Amino acid sequence: MKQLLDFIPLVVFFAAYKLYDIYIASGALIAATALSLAVTWMMYRKIEKMTLVTFAMVVVFGSLTLVFHNDLFIKWKVTIIYALFAVALLVSQFVMKQTLIQKMLGKELTLPQSVWGKLNFAWAMFFLVCGLVNIYIAFWLPQSVWVNFKVFGLTGVTLLFTLICGVYIYRHLPGDQEKPEEEKSEQP
């Protein structure tokens, strides 16, 4: 349910863009994100830090887009959010010596420290690459291409990357693992 609440503002943004324009869509994104945040608070009495950072960026860059009537601000939002996430992940790993990924998922999963480090670094690189691709699409391709990329491209690639990370995590979960056939046949 929580992921659905996080996804609704994106759907509202896309619909408003298709029906009206980028400026109505930016205002709708601000309103939908605020509403999503309020509903999340009412349902769970907790809001994740990443959600608060995203909300703040939506308000700041969405408002700048509306005030200056310039879509560059809303286009930069994606890259700046992803850059902040990447920096936070890298600082947690290399400065704080505890990965954010482990801090978020460590209560549910038991993984070797090296796996946590690889996952954390992989997500940091993922966010950096997505931010760079966003810059290219936002500034070199038509606005409609950027909107489709923001809504469908980034969502799709994030789901795919999450699935790949899930497979990677599954491979490293502790538990009874089958021995290779040669080892089984050698046992008395």
UniProtKB/Swiss-Prot annotation:
UniProt keyword Cell inner membrane present: yes
Membrane topology: Multi-pass membrane protein
Main location: membrane
GO cellular component: plasma membrane
Any Pfam family: IspA
Transmembrane segments: 22-42, 50-70, 72-92, 121-141, 149-169
Localization per record: Cell inner membrane
UniProt cross-references to NCBIfam families, sorted A to Z: ispZ, PRK00259.1-2, PRK00259.1-3, PRK00259.1-4
Family recorded in the similarity comment: Belongs to the YciB family.
Function: Plays a role in cell envelope biogenesis, maintenance of cell envelope integrity and membrane homeostasis.
Protein name per UniProt: Inner membrane-spanning protein YciB
Organism name: Pectobacterium carotovorum subsp. carotovorum (strain PC1)
Lineage, opening ranks: Bacteria, Pseudomonadati, Pseudomonadota, Gammaproteobacteria, Enterobacterales
